[in-house]
A protein has these predicted regions:
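N-terminal alpha/beta PP-like core and its mobile active-site loop of ThDP/TPP-dependent enzymes
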Residues: 1-234
Length: 234
């Protein structure tokens, strides 16, 4: 079937369970925002600066089961969002960064917002993708989501050229979204060693990362037993 890239992208985000996106509409992502506006599941949250959007997306990932998602314009939108994307990268917080791109069907240089943004954003993300066809859109977004949540989490960047968003092209059925396996239990020897170190410490303390967000009761029990102060990365 033939669908616009914007339609395909939003259907993929719905399949991933995304409920909110953050960003600013512009020349290179208006079609995405038109589709988001018609979604019965996703609410696009508009901001006055992409930096704020990135920190909002970071906060969503930290405090809920949702994946914080940006929808931004290329070049200036990417550089403005970089501080929040970098924060998520350093703290191991999953994030989807969906960026419009210049037209890939024109043999023209110096288009509006033309920038080698992959060279710019690659050091701040786990991976960066440039979509080259309509059929790639949903699988690429699913792959980005999977990478964002696998291993040490972090942001992943996906650029969708505006011509793919605007014009219809051949796409298959939206595939089933990926499922991330829960982390395996740490080896018993490592747990025993950590407990021995805590017992041996004269002034034990707990520095809790985002990965312990589902272990609140256990963390409190350990802290109370050790009478240890607790600090978090949140």
């Amino acid at each position: 079937m033939k669908r616009t890239g914007a339609w395909t992208a939003v259907r993929a985000l719905e399949a991933l369970g995304i409920r909110y996106t953050f960003g600013i509409p512009g020349v290179h992502n208006t079609e995405l925002y038109d589709e988001l506006n018609s979604s019965g599941q996703i609410t696009p949250v508009l901001v006055t600066h992409e930096g704020g959007a990135a920190f909002m997306a970071d906060g969503v990932s930290r405090t809920s089961e949702q994946t914080g998602t940006l929808v931004i314009v290329p070049a200036a939108g990417v550089t403005h969002a970089a501080s929040g994307i970098g924060e998520a990268f350093l703290d191991g917080v999953p994030m989807l960064v969906i960026c419009g791109g210049i037209r890939s069907d024109l043999d023209k240089r110096y288009q509006l917002h033309e920038l080698d943004q992959h060279a710019f954003i690659r050091p701040l993300t786990k991976a960066a993708f440039l979509v080259t066809s309509h059929a790639e859109i949903a699988p690429t977004l699913f792959k980005a989501w999977e990478i964002a949540h696998s291993g040490e989490p972090g942001p992943v960047f996906v650029e969708i050229p505006v011509n793919l968003q605007m014009f219809p092209g051949e796409v298959g059925e939206i595939p089933s979204p990926p499922v991330i396996a829960r982390p395996q239990r740490a080896p018993a020897g490592a747990i025993r060693h950590a407990a021995e170190m805590l017992f041996a410490a004269r002034h034990p303390g707990l520095f809790i990362g985002w990965g312990a967000r589902d272990a609140v009761a256990q963390t409190r029990a350990i802290a109370e037993f050790l009478q240890a102060p607790v600090a978090t990365t949140l």
